[in-house]
Amino acid sequence: MLQLTEKFKGTTTVGIVCSDGVVLAADRRASLGNIVYAKNVTKIHKIDEHLAIAGAGDVGDILNLVRLLRAEAKLYYAQSGKRMSVKALATLLANMLNGARMLPYLAWFLVGGFDEKPRLYSVDMMGGITEDKYVAAGSGMEFAYSVLDSEYREDLKVREGIKIAVEAINSAIKRDVFSGDGIMVVTITEEGYRELSNSRLKAILRQ
């Protein structure tokens, strides 16, 4: 019997910096203990046209922070007339998480975006922050890293990064019981945020 204290979980997420943008990818499964609770969970969240975060961990905690970050980004733009930078968003998130460390949010985040260039940060539940060229988080991260470590190059184009990100998530899905039920892929370039449709994703993977 499930206990009410068990948490709804999100699992494997991946981020890749390419020469022309950032790719974020995630599986769509959420589990409650050992039970698959949902099969179409959104784990990548648009903050504005050039910023997004991907979360692995407690779904409620992630969505709460997404709402706060969207509000802060809008307020920053209203007050300054400028978009928040990727680093500023990641630092804000890190400060929120560090401030709650006595009763922590149960989530690990990837913050990706494009300001002067594509950038990617990982932020852990204690507020530790690192800028990365590629990163994986969640229960299937070790399987995703086996792909990222062997396939990543700094001169990757977004189209190539999409294929590697999908391969990394698929590796996790095949081996991690808490990952599965499809893949969501988002790109963030100078032109802005774009979520790939299933048909578009399939077309890219066939090339």
Curated annotation (Swiss-Prot):
<feature type="active site" description="Nucleophile">
    <location>
        <position position="11"/>
    </location>
</feature>
<protein>
    <recommendedName>
        <fullName>Proteasome subunit beta 2</fullName>
        <ecNumber>3.4.25.1</ecNumber>
    </recommendedName>
</protein>
<dbReference type="InterPro" id="IPR029055">
    <property type="entry name" value="Ntn_hydrolases_N"/>
</dbReference>
<feature type="propeptide" description="Removed in mature form; by autocatalysis">
    <location>
        <begin position="1"/>
        <end position="10"/>
    </location>
</feature>
<dbReference type="GO" id="GO:0019774">
    <property type="term" value="C:proteasome core complex, beta-subunit complex"/>
</dbReference>
<keyword id="KW-0888">Threonine protease</keyword>
<comment type="subunit">
    <text>The 20S proteasome core is composed of 14 alpha and 14 beta subunits that assemble into four stacked heptameric rings, resulting in a barrel-shaped structure. The two inner rings, each composed of seven catalytic beta subunits, are sandwiched by two outer rings, each composed of seven alpha subunits. The catalytic chamber with the active sites is on the inside of the barrel. Has a gated structure, the ends of the cylinder being occluded by the N-termini of the alpha-subunits. Is capped at one or both ends by the proteasome regulatory ATPase, PAN.</text>
</comment>
<dbReference type="Pfam" id="PF00227">
    <property type="entry name" value="Proteasome"/>
</dbReference>
<keyword id="KW-0865">Zymogen</keyword>
<dbReference type="InterPro" id="IPR001353">
    <property type="entry name" value="Proteasome_sua/b"/>
</dbReference>
<dbReference type="InterPro" id="IPR023333">
    <property type="entry name" value="Proteasome_suB-type"/>
</dbReference>
<dbReference type="GO" id="GO:0005737">
    <property type="term" value="C:cytoplasm"/>
</dbReference>
<keyword id="KW-0647">Proteasome</keyword>
<comment type="similarity">
    <text>Belongs to the peptidase T1B family.</text>
</comment>
<keyword id="KW-0963">Cytoplasm</keyword>
<dbReference type="InterPro" id="IPR000243">
    <property type="entry name" value="Pept_T1A_subB"/>
</dbReference>
<keyword id="KW-0378">Hydrolase</keyword>
<keyword id="KW-0645">Protease</keyword>
<comment type="function">
    <text>Component of the proteasome core, a large protease complex with broad specificity involved in protein degradation.</text>
</comment>
<dbReference type="InterPro" id="IPR019983">
    <property type="entry name" value="Pept_T1A_Psome_bsu_arc"/>
</dbReference>
<keyword id="KW-0068">Autocatalytic cleavage</keyword>
<dbReference type="GO" id="GO:0004298">
    <property type="term" value="F:threonine-type endopeptidase activity"/>
</dbReference>
<dbReference type="InterPro" id="IPR016050">
    <property type="entry name" value="Proteasome_bsu_CS"/>
</dbReference>
<dbReference type="GO" id="GO:0010498">
    <property type="term" value="P:proteasomal protein catabolic process"/>
</dbReference>
